[in-house]
UniProtKB/Swiss-Prot annotation:
Broadest EC class assigned to this enzyme: translocase
PANTHER family: NA(+)-TRANSLOCATING NADH-QUINONE REDUCTASE SUBUNIT A (PTHR37839:SF1)
Keyword Membrane: no
Organism name: Haemophilus ducreyi (strain 35000HP / ATCC 700724)
Biological processes annotated in GO: sodium ion transport
Role summary: NQR complex catalyzes the reduction of ubiquinone-1 to ubiquinol by two successive reactions, coupled with the transport of Na(+) ions from the cytoplasm to the periplasm. NqrA to NqrE are probably involved in the second step, the conversion of ubisemiquinone to ubiquinol.
Protein name per Swiss-Prot or TrEMBL: Na(+)-translocating NADH-quinone reductase subunit A
């Protein structure tokens, strides 16, 4: 077992009850284009087209063979694009239950499948995009082979669901999915929380992690178990995609159910809800929120994406929906107040010393300014890197030094705590993405 000593468990109120309920019915779903790093779509549908569940919506021009399939049957009501015609979303109004079927196997056949059979079925069904690479966090090429595959079956994000509750709901499908992964012919690492009982199968290497967030992030797992570099790549996926793999191979149908944590200070009844991949989040949260100007987040409060307008949908990789009150109100002479209702990792407010949960808002309590190296980054960074120097290089655009300091091991979510504790209010995620894009381009 690996225990993480550095990090931060954000003391935020309204964690979800770990019991699964059915969520609101949604009649719109979407595929979000900006989730897929470096993807350039070749559209296979137009607005007004009728599509079946599992039908190809678009293909990646830059990654031949990688297709993105419809999460529901219905009508394509919008294809939203942003600046420079970047694809934001393909929105489907859910109608009927027509679907495309894929190759089906008996459970007893799964352990004898070839790697080619596994790849072909995942690619055809559009489930190949469940894999992401490290470094760069991109969907892998269909003919690529990683050094290993990581299945993340733990979650330490604030307000997250307990993966064990969901996995045990789909125990057999999870085991089938693990069996399918083994047939790809590379080492499969299953990472779970210490002491938690979840199913596994022969051939899987099980690891346990304990400690504060980010103990549950896949970047932490990769760093300690099988570190990557510019010439070594690993893949990772989450436990709900493993369940979807198992469903696909034993039923021949695309499984698009998602169980997500609906939580946060503005949620009336925080709990786990069953919905569908790409669900419209305004519809999912109807009647669920307290009065106020709320920000709905697809994902964690630390690293999720604001869901509104053309991207008001559950992300492909999101396992939670978080809701915070917009922090619009200004506080007169707030800087001289003791701050008993505020939290900080430093001893600058009284709330630091109080063992309580806080109703966080989106307010950042200050404007962006220069980095201030007061040791805050080191307190929340458990990886074997020097965070202050790395963040300085990312801010300065020095990719050579950033690469030497370990930026290739990271994704935006791995720097989310550094962003949160930064006295200068700097957002390091976009800086990291800019550096990674430049490193990949320059080779």
């Amino acid at each position: 077992m690996i225990t993480i000593k550095k990090g931060l468990d954000l003391p935020i109120a309204a964690s979800p009850a770990q019991v699964i309920h059915n969520g609101n019915t949604v009649n719109e779903v979407a595929m979000l284009g900006e989730e897929y790093v470096g993807m350039r779509p070749s559209m296979k549908v137009r607005e007004g087209d009728l599509v079946k569940k599992g039908q190809v919506l678009f293909e990646d021009k830059k990654n031949a063979g990688v297709v993105f399939t419809a999460p529901a049957s219905g009508t394509v009501v919008a294809i939203n694009r942003g600046e420079k015609r970047v694809l934001q979303s393909v929105v489907i109004k859910v109608e009927g239950d027509e679907q495309i079927t894929f190759t089906r196997y008996e459970a007893a056949q799964l352990a004898s499948l070839s790697a080619e059979q596994v790849r072909a079925n995942l690619i055809d069904a559009g489930l190949w995009i469940a894999f992401r690479t490290r470094p760069f966090s991109k969907v892998p090429a269909v003919d690529a082979t990683p050094a290993s595959i990581f299945v993340n079956a733990m979650d330490t994000n604030p307000l997250s669901a307990d993966p064990a509750v969901i996995i045990n709901e789909y125990k057999n499908d999870f085991e089938y999915g693990l069996t399918v992964l083994i047939r790809l012919g590379v080492k499969v690492n299953l990472v779970k929380a210490a002491g938690v009982n979840i199913p596994t199968v022969d051939g899987i290497t099980v690891h346990e992690f304990a400690g504060k967030h980010p103990a549950g992030l896949v970047g932490t797992h990769i760093h300690f178990i099988d570190p990557v570099n510019l010439t070594k790549t690993v893949w990772h996926l989450n436990y709900q995609d493993v369940i979807a793999f198992g469903k696909l191979f034993t039923t021949g149908e695309l499984f698009t159910d998602r169980v997500v944590a609906l939580a946060g200070p503005q949620v009336k009844t925080p709990r786990l809800v069953r919905t569908r991949l790409g669900a419209n989040l305004s519809q999912l949260t109807t009647g669920e929120l307290n009065v106020g100007e709320n920000r709905i987040i697809s994902g964690s409060v630390l690293s999720g994406a604001t869901a509104s307008g053309p991207v008001d949908f559950l992300g492909r990789y999101a396992l939670q929906v978080s809701v915070l009150l917009e922090g619009c109100e200004k506080e007169l002479l707030g800087w001289v107040m003791p701050g008993s209702d505020k939290y900080s990792i430093t001893r600058t407010v009284l709330g630091h010393f109080r063992k309580k949960l806080f109703n966080f808002t989106t307010a950042v309590h200050g404007g962006e300014r220069a980095m201030v190296p007061i040791g805050a980054y080191e307190r929340v960074m458990p990886l074997d890197i020097i965070p202050t120097l790395l963040l300085r290089d990312l801010a300065a655009g020095d990719t050579d030094s950033a690469q030497n300091l370990g930026c290739l091991e990271l994704d935006e979510e791995d720097l989310a705590l550094c962003t949160y504790v930064c006295p200068g209010k700097n957002n390091y995620g976009p800086m990291l993405r800019t550096a990674l894009d430049k490193i990949e381009k320059e080779g």
